[in-house]
Amino acid sequence: MNARRIALSLGAAICLTATVHAAAPAAADAAFLKEAALDGQFDIQSSRLAERLGHNEVVKKYAAQMVDDNRRIENALKKLAMDKKVDLPVGPGDAHHAALKKLSAQKGDAFDRAYMEQAGPKRQAASLKQFQQAAANAKDKDVRAFAQEMVPVLTDHHTRAVETAAALKK
């Protein structure tokens, strides 16, 4: 009888462990979620600066859309991370803090150029690539679905960034 209880207990423990592990995404998926959170926070904070300090109306309009879109992405990301038990970083991270500090020291046209250098086409292309890779390769189906859902939004961000940068050169 005791052997049977032990066997049942071990079987239940193994099933419970498998369930717990199934709920947590693969390390690469968790890393994607964390990196997306850091990058999103940078996009929000740099774009909020651009709304305040930007000189060109095209830049301000781009920045406002980036804030709105990235807030929606952030909300979906936070919900997914909570469901997957992934702790997301708070704020944009050390590397992004330095860029934000440097950016906030700029004024007028110099600010607009610096903002587009930091949050413009190159940055948006990198984000798009990151999400495309997760959309194709994430092990967790929910992480993959999230990335797939956001790819069109990030494609639009990249297109707008290219258009805004081009408008500054005119």
Can you say where each PLM-predicted feature lies in the sequence?
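His/Met- and acidic-residue-enriched segments that coordinate or traffic transition-metal cofactors
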Residues: 2-11, 15-170
